[in-house]
Amino acid sequence: MKEINSNILSDITVHMKYAKYIPELQRRETWEELVDRNMAMHIKKYPELEVEIRKAYSYVFTKQILPSMRSLQFAGKPIEISPNRLYNCSYLPVDSLDAFNEIMFLLLSGCGVGYSVQQHHIKKLPFIMQPFKFRTRRFVIGDSIEGWSDAVKVLIRSYLGEKRASRIVFDYTDIRPKGARLVTSGGKAPGPQPLKECLIKVEGILEAKDDGSRLTSLEVHDIICHIADAVLAGGIRRAALISLFTATDDDMISCKSGNWWETNPQRGRSNNSAVLMRHKITKEFFMDLWKRVELSGAGETGIYLNNDKDWGTNPCCEIALRPFQFCTLCEVNVSNVKDQDDLNARVKAAAFIGTLQAGYTDFHYLREIWKETTEKDALIGVSMTGIGSAAVLQMDMKAAANIVTKENARVAKLIGINSSARCTTVKPAGTTSLVLGTSSGIHAWHNDYYVRRMRVGKNEAIYDYLLAYHNDLIEDEFFRPHDTAVISIPQKAPDGSILRTESPFDTLERVKRVAEEWIQPGHRRGSNTHNVSATISLKENEWKKAGDWMWENREYYNGLSVLPYDGGTYTQAPFEDIDEAKYNKMSKVLSNVDLTKVIEAEDNTDLSGELACAGGSCEIV
């Protein structure tokens, strides 16, 4: 019974978030077709490894491991044209004008971006030089990712160039109208409006500055958040950003206080973290900042512990990145591992695929330094999800991590790239856990029995199919019954699982143990290790003790997302506890879904549905 339940959840997630539209069949891919497309891409690039590739992918077909979800989504022509689409994570300091248009390019490519607005980075930006008032230059925006990125580039340079420039007048006529088909990536064109709004808002920030002044960290941050707004509306992906700032920067610390949601809604696009240098930080300063996090009532601002002032991380904080570096991820399903041999075989297959992914570095548009830095460390991030089922905690994770580094070195040599500087990680796995039917990343299961919900538009073909064939799964959305429905699927945690009723200190100790036994053995070189991405919920009386734990154990994490505990109940919440009787009653009527019956006359895939995780918030679908 449990299998049908998690299969339904998995099939619907894959269909809505990753499957590509096949015009000649008027439907989206099945899991097998999707994985086949991904595997074919690697066989085309590495034909001499075809036998090994097919063997490793036998673990993907059976959902024991997953490759990069970006590579599943964009395998084939999109990645051949733009290999950066394969990567989950990137990081850059905003220390030159190129950063702004590169961030637009990366976000439009579906990549999560970490960026630094620390004072020592932004002070390298040029002084403002207002453009001529009455001299204008028309700029025709190209109808492509590069075209949108170049629009940001020319606008920024018209205010921050080496000499006074003409005022830019943008021409949007070449941009396809809203709803036109996107041939390469799939889905529908957003039309020019999101970009137009972004450029107007960015110009508003620049126009308000005086000649000879500098952009502040908050102004740089806001410009990037406006860029992310255009990407979100552009339908590529819920833009994922993390902004790293100097720990004494009060403007950044308080940028999400007050009624910011109304006055500066763009700031919701980014998680923000103060950078603390491990070797310099005092307990007094740490605790003072921790108190501010508690008093914010929203886990703001985040804290990022660093060993190098120029290094950074990705939005989910699980990857340690040099400036101008990418990382590609893989996932190992450890929820149902049978024994050590099974675990070892899975991590070996994941390391094999991850290393193949690290070979796609023929980037374009970006500065040459991106290719150099990415090839230097050739990072992979082999992650585990389903840790909450507790099976892997009975096994030798160090031995498994050593297999990852060994296999990475072997395959890197075969394909002519460097071995990875950092190999093992734990990502939040908000969406991949739905595909695999596991708890997410390091986190506990929600409950022994619970309902998992997903929202779907009534204009989507899958809604018509579910209504006709599986109407027990679907109901009107309480607040938007006119255009939205809710899919509800009962779920059961494996026997012996860790449940979310555990103490937050149990979660923290598990983070520490996995950091010691999985992350550190997978670290070869670099200032920072990869990280266990985790969200910790704290009740009012737990903040002081948690702050002490964070200080005492600062060697074992780079950043953790901390939120006030929310014991509230909501109508049609993404998760809802139920008892065994209700689980059995709901499960009795379930039957396997056949999504090949979902016929679509045109491509309606929505790439923005794939959540770019940010802490625990990526649990909300």
Locate each region found by the language model.
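Extended catalytic cores of very large enzyme megasubunits
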Residues: 1-621
